């Protein structure tokens, strides 16, 4: 993938940032009984891949396909102003690289963005690999497990810092890009603390996990970048316009 440093890199989280809530939790909460939900989620630790693997096998045993579940994914709402932000990016795409980095599996996030007709503004997707295996009729989705990590801020399935560094190692042309990280959660703090520089910017959703961490000096002191706390997409547009080098 080609790229040059004359573009700004817009890095997006998904759950709580692009969409209101958690798309996988919406899927599970809509389709499972309390007993089934406990079974799927009781992995002993935060482990998205293991939970989704259990979920897919359970739903397959009921004869369900992804076509049965697509309407639930389609019903998830964007956060206020996110589509306006996406439209701004589309109109100015020559200035920006756009990457999604999520702890979700990439099937449900990609499906959602394709259905909402915003998939094309993204240049790259970082997340848990997942696909429909037509040869395996006993599995709804095939979830691929990434190597284990020891990060305390990320779900055990995926460390955002680890995966972003892997991406940069294969796509070195992105290393010199100024970054705007649009996010909200604990695992976003991980990447912000470990990689983002003084020349980068963070747009963290007001009132959510990242914001709560930043109210404490022990966490705040580790962030080098300037941080905006946002409620609506227009605030992010204004933040990018004011601070982007391009």
What are these regions (language model features)?
Residues 2-129:
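Alpha-helical substrate-recognition element adjacent to the catalytic core
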Residues 1-3, 171-172:
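Short boundary motifs at domain starts and secondary-structure transition points
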Residues 9, 80-99, 104-246:
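C-terminal cap/substrate-recognition subdomain and adjoining C-terminal extension
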């Amino acid at each position: 993938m080609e790229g040059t440093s004359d573009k700004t890199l817009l890095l997006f989280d998904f759950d709580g940032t692009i969409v209101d809530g958690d798309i996988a939790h919406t899927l599970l909460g809509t389709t499972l009984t309390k007993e089934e939900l406990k079974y799927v989620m009781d992995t002993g630790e935060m482990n998205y891949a293991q939970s989704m693997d259990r979920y897919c096998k359970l739903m397959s045993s009921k004869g369900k396909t992804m076509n049965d579940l697509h309407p639930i994914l389609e019903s998830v709402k964007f956060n206020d102003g996110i589509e306006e932000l996406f439209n701004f990016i589309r109109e100015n795409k020559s200035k920006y690289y756009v990457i999604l980095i999520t702890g979700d599996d990439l099937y449900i996030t990609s499906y959602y963005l394709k259905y909402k007709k915003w998939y094309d503004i993204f240049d790259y997707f970082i997340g848990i690999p997942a696909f429909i295996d037509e040869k395996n009729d006993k599995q709804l989705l095939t979830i691929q497990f990434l190597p284990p990590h020891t990060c305390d801020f990320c779900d055990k399935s995926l460390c955002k810092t680890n995966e972003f560094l892997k991406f940069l190692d294969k796509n070195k042309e992105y290393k010199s890009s100024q970054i705007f990280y649009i996010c909200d959660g604990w695992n976003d703090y991980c990447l912000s603390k470990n990689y983002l520089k003084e020349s980068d910017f963070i747009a963290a959703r007001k009132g959510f996990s990242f914001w709560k961490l930043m109210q404490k000096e022990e966490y705040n002191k580790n962030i080098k970048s300037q941080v905006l706390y946002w409620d609506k997409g227009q605030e992010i547009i204004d933040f990018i316009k004011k601070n982007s080098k391009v």
